């Protein structure tokens, strides 16, 4: 709408300037005293004025001709796909399609008596059509000349479609990241749905036209296709026990401030070498919530040793060592392990020392739930989590032990601050790595990446739509799009390619792509974004060197992107597509010329003529329409 408004205002501004010039010209003639000049002026002025304002109708006619050409091209394609050979039947099919295509333009009248569809000797369907455009200005009566122009302006178009046309597969890759919110997303939906009508034709025989839609943000949501593309995540093992202590707790009645400090605890029952966890002490609080080794003095007292990183050393509880005086209370509990960490029992857990685990659904010891831990393997059925559970409650039943490695249902990792984080596997995917990173090799031979998304940068709800000729299904998906997340444009680019690649047909057998054959199949990928690609991955998690806008560092993994910068990955993928003869169009919505985003889009596109940088919603619609027309022209002869 903004583009049309600007064009109309441009015409009126031109008319205004012409009017000022005419006024100045008239003033000069008014001062002219010679009669013949005044007479000529009086006769010519009305003509000059009407010619000036008639430019409005000329502009409208030009716009209508573009719309008529689009409608006639589509109608001719429909006639060419029909099984008919007589002009009568071809005209019946073509006119029906043309009438439907022109319903959006109520101000024009189709001249059916001057619309023809015929088949020539070279099996080319030839169509000609005219419409009448009602004039707004130029039908004024000009005494003594009469009407300056008729009430209607005739506008014509011509189209030819070779019946040996091509099948069409188009992938539409759409940026639905957080920056696309508000009016941008509204504009995108309008433009994308208009493109669907241009590309996907109602008649699918003898040649088909199909479109896939790939919404992307932090990744591409594959929905039910995810397991087949990146593998089924490893599930959990059931937990049957979790404990860290043995025996009863023993009350503390005193601790001296000495080196070593002596603990008084009547009938404590501890032996030298036992490990204990001390808590609840008042006054000398510095000793609380720590693991110690016991040195027995007698049945009522013992001293403590602490692990210094290499050995057990005497605990000095003097004031000079930072300890306050004991006042009351406290308990000591005997531990199963030297660090007093929780031992989890899960048959066949499959974990090794230094692996990570995520625990959930434990009853009783509920404090252990919802966190990731680094483990020490004890046996094939037990492991410790290197953390004490004194405040977590006592285990009663149940629980799930999830491996935390790449490929598991949960990814447990350390972030750049070395804190342990845990994220669930989503149905989104990340980039493929290895030798097939920039090819369309089948996912059966080279899996794509898992995606572990966090709650502040989530997997988009809209999932991928493989090739379809159902315009309602395609438009419903477009209408459902919502914005959120950062920009993994390289992943969207990859899946644009994959949806038109026959190597991925095993994912969607009923929506598979045709075998590449330039004679009867045209493939195109349209990549749309509004900014920088900023979200590469390492081991399924956003890499620590991801660019600004990719989320906070808390939920990034402490390794750099395996495949490098998102832009570099996108460029390599585009090169791979173009090498196969796939036509690549790029659309940078409100992307500044000269920016890094504009540069990569230009490099990705098949040529400079295939790269667009629309600055407004109206410009975006115009860009998509231009792409749709270009794709259509590749299938028709004129």
Explain the meaning of each model-derived region.
Residues 50-57, 163-188, 527-532:
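MIDAS-like acidic motif and immediate structural context at the N-terminus
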Residues 98-101, 573-638:
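Von Willebrand factor A/integrin I-like adhesion domains
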């Amino acid at each position: 709408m903004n583009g049309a408004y600007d064009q109309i205002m441009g015409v009126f501004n031109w008319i205004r300037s012409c009017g000022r010039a005419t006024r100045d010209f008239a003033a000069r003639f008014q001062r002219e005293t010679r009669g013949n000049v005044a007479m000529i002026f009086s006769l010519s002025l009305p003509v000059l004025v009407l010619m000036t304002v008639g430019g409005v109708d000329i502009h409208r006619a030009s716009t209508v001709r573009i719309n008529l050409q689009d409608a006639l091209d589509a109608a001719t394609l429909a006639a060419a796909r029909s099984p008919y050979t007589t002009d009568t039947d071809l005209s019946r099919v073509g006119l029906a399609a043309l009438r439907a295509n022109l319903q959006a333009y109520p101000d024009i009248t189709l001249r059916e008596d001057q619309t023809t569809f015929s088949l020539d000797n070279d099996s080319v369907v030839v169509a000609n059509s005219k419409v009448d455009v009602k004039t707004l200005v130029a039908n004024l009566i000009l005494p003594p000349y009469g009407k300056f122009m008729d009430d209607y302006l005739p506008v014509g178009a011509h189209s030819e479609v070779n019946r040996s046309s091509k099948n069409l597969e188009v992938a539409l890759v759409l940026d639905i990241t957080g920056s696309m919110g508000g009016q941008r997303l509204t504009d995108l939906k309008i433009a994308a749905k208009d493109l669907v009508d241009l590309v996907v034709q109602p008649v699918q025989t003898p040649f088909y036209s199909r479109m896939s839609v790939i919404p992307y943000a932090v990744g591409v949501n594959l929905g039910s296709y995810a397991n087949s593309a990146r593998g089924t995540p490893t599930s959990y093992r059931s937990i049957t026990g979790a404990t860290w202590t043995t025996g009863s707790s023993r009350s503390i009645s005193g601790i001296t401030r000495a080196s070593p400090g002596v603990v008084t605890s009547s009938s404590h029952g501890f032996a030298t070498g036992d490990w204990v966890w001390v808590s609840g002490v008042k006054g000398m609080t510095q000793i609380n919530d720590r693991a110690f080794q016991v040195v027995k003095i007698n049945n009522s007292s013992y001293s403590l040793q602490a692990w210094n990183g290499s050995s057990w050393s005497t605990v000095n509880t003097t004031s000079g060592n930072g300890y306050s005086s004991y006042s009351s209370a406290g308990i000591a509990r005997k531990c199963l392990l030297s660090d007093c960490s929780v031992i989890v029992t899960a048959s066949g857990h499959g974990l090794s020392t230094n692996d990570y685990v995520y625990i959930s659904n434990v009853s009783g010891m509920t404090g252990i739930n919802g966190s990731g831990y680094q483990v020490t393997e004890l046996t094939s059925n037990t492991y410790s989590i290197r953390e004490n559970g004194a405040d977590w409650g006592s285990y009663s039943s149940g629980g799930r032990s999830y491996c935390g490695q790449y490929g598991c249902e949960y990814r447990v990792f350390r972030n750049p601050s070395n804190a342990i984080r845990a994220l669930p596997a989503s149905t989104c995917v990340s980039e493929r790595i290895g030798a097939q990173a920039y090819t369309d090799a089948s996912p059966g031979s080279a899996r794509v990446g898992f995606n572990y998304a966090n709650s502040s940068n989530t997997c988009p709800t809209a999932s991928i739509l493989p090739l379809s000729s159902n315009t309602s299904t395609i438009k419903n998906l477009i209408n459902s799009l919502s914005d959120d997340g950062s920009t993994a444009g390289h992943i969207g680019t990859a899946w644009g390619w994959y949806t038109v690649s026959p190597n991925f047909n095993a994912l969607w057998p009923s929506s598979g792509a045709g075998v590449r054959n330039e004679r009867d199949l045209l493939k195109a990928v349209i990549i749309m974004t509004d900014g920088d690609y900023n979200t590469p991955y390492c081991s399924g998690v956003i890499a620590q060197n991801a660019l600004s806008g990719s989320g906070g560092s808390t939920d990034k993994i402490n390794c750099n992107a395996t495949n490098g910068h998102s832009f570099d990955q996108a460029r390599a993928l585009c090169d791979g597509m173009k090498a196969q003869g796939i036509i690549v169009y790029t659309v940078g919505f409100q992307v500044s010329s000269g920016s890094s985003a504009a540069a990569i889009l230009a490099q990705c596109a098949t040529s400079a003529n295939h790269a667009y940088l629309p600055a407004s919603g109206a410009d975006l619609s115009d860009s998509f329409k231009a792409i749709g027309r270009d794709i259509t022209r590749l299938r028709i002869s004129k």
